[in-house]
Structures are given as C-alpha cells and as structure tokens.
C-alpha cells in the first residue's frame, strides 16, 4: 500500500512449536518459501518449543535476547513470525529488535498484492489488507513497521494511503461496494454458463501443485506458471475439446495453503467459489512434495467449507517423474507428469474416462436424412461407436442427463 524503493531484504524466520502441534516443520518450510517468493533472502530461522505463546513478545525473553543478537550480527532487516501476531506483540517485538516485524498472514497478503493482475483481484487483495490492518492501527495512525517499506507494505497499485481508522473503514465500505458490482456481473456470466450444455471442469489444489501446467498442457496455451507459491490468483476459464468434438470448459483458480488468512478467504470467496459451479473437480497434488498428505487435507478441508464435497472428483498426483514407489492416499487416482511429452493425451484420456462415469450411456439410430445433426451432438456427447447400416447408422455413446433432450431430435 506504500510505495518504496527496492532493496534486498535479509530476513530471519521465527517459529514457536506448541505441544501437540501438527505440521510445524511443514509450516516453517512454507514460511521460508513464502519469504523467497516475496523477494527476501532468508538468512536463518529460530525455533522454540513452548506450552503457549508469550502474550507480550510471542517468544520467551531468553530467546528474544538471542534473536536480538542475531539481528545485529547478521544485519537482519526484517523478522517474519510464523503465526498471527497481536498488535501488542508486533509493537513489542519491533521495539526490542529495532527492525520491521511482520507475521505469516501479512507476508501472504503481501504476495497476493504482488500477484494481483485483474481489477477484481486487486480489489480483493486491497480489501483483505485493509481488514487485516484495521485492528492494528495505533490511535489515529499506523504501526511504524508499515512505514518501513518492502515486504509487508506492498499493495495492488496504490502509492499512498491515508492511514487512520475512519479512512480505512471508508475504504473497506467503498471496495465492498465495488466488489458487489463485480460479483453481480460474475453471477450473470456464471448463470449463463450453468444454463449452457457445455461440461464444466474445475482445477483445484494446493499452491504450486501444477494446476497451471495442466491448464497449459490441455489448452496448448500459455498461462503464467512457475515453481513458486501463488503464481496464479485470478480465476481463468478456457474452452477445449476432448475425444473429438466434446466441448468442455476448464477453470483454474487460486491455489490453497494451510492457515490461509481469513481476510483472504473472505475477500476471495467469490473467486474460490468458481470451482463450486462445475460438473467435475480435478484435484491436483504434487506427489513429489514430502508433505503432500498434509496438502491434501488442507484442500479437502477448504472444499468442505465451500460445500464442494459432493461434486464428482478426479485425483491427479502430479510430478510422477520426481518420485519412486509412490503410495497414494486418495482412491481412485492417476499418477502423471504434466510436463512429459505424452501428458496431453494421457490427461485427455483420464478426463474422458471420468466424464463417461458421470454421463449416461445411450444407443441411437440415426437415419441418413438426419446425419447432419451428428456434428452438433458431438459437442455435448462422447460418441463411442458408429455402426453404419443400409438406412443410416447406430451410435452408442455417453451424454449428460441435462442434454438427453438432444437425442430426441433424431427420433422419427
């Protein structure tokens, strides 16, 4: 939200592991990846085991002294805490350490601000940042760390921001109003899409699982992809043809991550819910990631929150070229490598097989006088066999329940 000059940020990561905490190592590794994605140089990390977080400084006083020495010795410019800090903890840590301190939530918000491309995406990120910022305003101003620039202070195209409570509340109201207009337009487009006979596929998965690679492979078009977190923010929908003429739409949206800030979930709800209005969900999982089971649980949990559990699902374990003797946790599944030469044909075959399970089988006698209508039928159905007879042909295939009326056009 505040424009600053670019310079290298040397960061120190801090994590506190409470008793019985799951996935602490994963969380710390992700924090390092997030920091690198934001452009920081991760110098080191400090970990501490405690029964509870210190209410004043998050870590214990002894550990805080060690951290202060490290900050001075290694010329640390930013400390990133792997947890949501209270405003009080944030201010106290900065006073003791003498450098900018941000938490995991602020870091993720910062990356989203970097990645936002569309008008809607920028509005959603800006709204999430303001909601995060509001309880952290001190009096009529903002904590000093926000004036320091760099990681944690970036915004979607905004150079200056008048930071006081009334201003922030007014901006939140204004952005929410703008988003309602955008969401109304999105709902209109979605309604037309739902009325369409076209089969709809949604890609979901943990961030950096390879969804954009699969999207590019199937569409033969280029969408930004990189080995980094949150490379894609905006929902993207493209049309493709499978098995000849069957037309389907493919939608890719923002990847998930554990502890996704509630401000982002709220702001991006309409974008996340794009995957809710599909006929088939393709859950993409990075099989090479040692924490893929935890990733799966996170995605399934968010799917549950968005009421997406009952949508037919195809599970794809991606990056098969990087693993050996892989054991899946979800059944049924397919193990693929989206970047391999034959991946396009493999993906198309997998999708067609799954669609056949969803569609209903049919057998249709088509007289030669109506054969010209077969081309239109192919766009909404999978034609399995065509047996030519003296007076026409017999077609067997699969079609969606909502499109079975299309078969009536061939009846005498």
Question: Where do the model's predicted regions map?
Answer:
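Conserved C-terminal guanine-recognition region of P-loop GTPase G domains, centered on the G4
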Residues: 28-34, 68-71, 85-95, 245-246, ...
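Switch I (effector-binding) loop of TRAFAC-class P-loop GTPase G-domains
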Residues: 186, 193-199, 218-247, 262-267, ...
């Amino acid at each position: 939200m505040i424009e600053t000059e670019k310079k290298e940020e040397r960061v120190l990561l801090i994590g506190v592991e409470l008793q019985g905490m799951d996935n602490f190592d994963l969380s710390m590794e992700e924090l390092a990846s997030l920091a690198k994605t934001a452009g920081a140089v991760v110098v080191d990390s400090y970990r501490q085991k405690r029964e509870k977080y210190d209410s004043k400084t998050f870590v214990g006083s002894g550990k805080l002294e060690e951290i202060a020495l490290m900050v001075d010795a290694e010329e640390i410019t930013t400390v990133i805490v792997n947890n949501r800090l209270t405003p009080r903890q944030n201010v106290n840590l900065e006073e003791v350490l003498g450098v900018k301190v941000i938490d995991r939530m602020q870091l993720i918000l910062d990356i989203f601000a970097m990645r936002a491309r569309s008008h809607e995406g920028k509005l959603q990120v800006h709204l999430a940042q303001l909601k995060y910022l509001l309880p952290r305003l001190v009096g009529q101003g903002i904590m000093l760390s926000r004036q320091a620039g760099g990681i944690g202070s970036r915004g979607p195209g905004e150079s200056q921001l008048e930071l006081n409570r009334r201003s922030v509340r007014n901006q939140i109201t204004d952005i929410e109003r703008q988003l309602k207009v955008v969401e109304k337009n999105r709902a209109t487009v979605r309604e037309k899409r739902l009325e369409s006979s076209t089969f709809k596929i949604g890609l979901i998965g943990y961030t950096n699982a390879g969804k954009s690679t699969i999207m590019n492979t199937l569409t033969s078009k280029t969408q930004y992809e990189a080995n980094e977190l949150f490379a894609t923010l905006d929902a993207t929908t493209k049309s493709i043809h499978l098995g000849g003429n069957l037309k389907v739409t493919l939608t890719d949206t923002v990847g998930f991550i554990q502890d996704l800030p509630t401000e982002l979930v709220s702001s991006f709800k309409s974008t996340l819910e794009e995957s809710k209005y599909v006929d088939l969900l393709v859950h993409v999982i990075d099989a090479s990631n040692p924490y893929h089971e935890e990733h799966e649980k996170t995605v399934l949990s968010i799917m549950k929150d968005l009421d997406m559990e009952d949508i037919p699902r195809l599970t794809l374990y991606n990056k098969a070229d990087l693993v050996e003797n892989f054991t899946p946790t979800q059944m049924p599944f397919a193990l693929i490598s989206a970047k391999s030469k034959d991946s396009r044909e493999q993906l198309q075959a997998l999708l067609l097989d799954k669609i056949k399970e969803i569609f209903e089988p049919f057998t249709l006698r088509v007289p030669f006088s109506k054969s010209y209508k077969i081309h239109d039928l192919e766009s909404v159905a999978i034609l399995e066999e065509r047996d030519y007879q003296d007076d026409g042909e017999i077609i067997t295939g699969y079609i969606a329940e909502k499109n079975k009326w299309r078969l009536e056009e061939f009846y005498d």
